[in-house]
A protein has these predicted regions:
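N-terminal intrinsically disordered, cationic/polar leader segments
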Residues: 1-16, 26, 30-96
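Short, conserved glycine- and acidic-residue-centered signature motifs
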Residues: 17-21
Length: 96
């Protein structure tokens, strides 16, 4: 999952669309980190949080696959809801 850029709904630091997207991305990152700490990933998670960009990748163990899928699906669903509520400010692209 990658979230980057600015929604340009309001000025930087006062943008509720960016705040919503940031909360979703940071929550996904924290959940993946928690999965890693619990030994539920096959290898170390890749989490980058820097300058308007959040990148989260994880390779779950077989028994944690559904948990990871639900985590990313939830974040994606939240992003899609933001995209519908604020068209033109959030783009959601899904890559397999």
């Amino acid at each position: 999952m990658e979230v980057r850029g600015h929604a340009d709904f309001a000025e930087l630091g006062k943008d509720p669309v960016c705040a919503g997207a940031s909360v979703l991305a940071m929550t996904a990152a924290q959940c993946v980190k928690s999965m890693e700490e619990a030994g539920r990933l096959r290898k170390k998670a890749h989490i980058v949080i820097r300058g308007g960009r959040v990148l989260v990748t994880a390779k779950p163990r077989e028994e944690a696959f559904d948990e990871a899928r639900l985590l990313f699906w939830t974040a994606e669903t939240g992003m899609r809801l933001l995209s519908e509520a604020y068209p033109g400010h959030i783009k959601v692209k899904k890559e397999e």
